[in-house]
Amino acid sequence: MTNESEVGVKKAAELLRQGATMLEEACPICKMPLFKLKNGDVVCPVHGKVYIVKSDDEEKIVKRNLQLDEIESILIDGLYLSAKKMKEDPLDSERIIQIIRYLDALERLRKIKINSSE
């Protein structure tokens, strides 16, 4: 057994001990069985959260949501770095404008996410 599969088996055993249910579907990447947690999430013991889609339209929606989440994460990281740099010079007008732009972009992104989920 390879090291990765040993780790996967140990994590799978831990998921079962925690009350997860083993599903008949397998991870498309590593072929390990998928597990359904008590909260309803489906996870691979090796790769973490997995999204099961039943149609091309559903796949597009999931991919779009993942991309929006990634963009949101990038914006939050940029906002955090700008705020951290602003501590050095609180009167830096360029930095203030940059923070406002990050906040505006985050607000727009969240509106897009809300509208797409309706």
Swiss-Prot record:
Superkingdom to which the source organism belongs: Archaea
InterPro entries referenced in this protein's UniProt entry, alphabetically: SSSCA1, UPF0148
Pfam families: Auto_anti-p27
Stated family: Belongs to the UPF0148 family.
Protein name: UPF0148 protein SSO0781
Originating organism: Saccharolobus solfataricus (strain ATCC 35092 / DSM 1617 / JCM 11322 / P2) (Sulfolobus solfataricus)
Lineage of the organism: Archaea, Thermoproteota, Thermoprotei, Sulfolobales, Sulfolobaceae
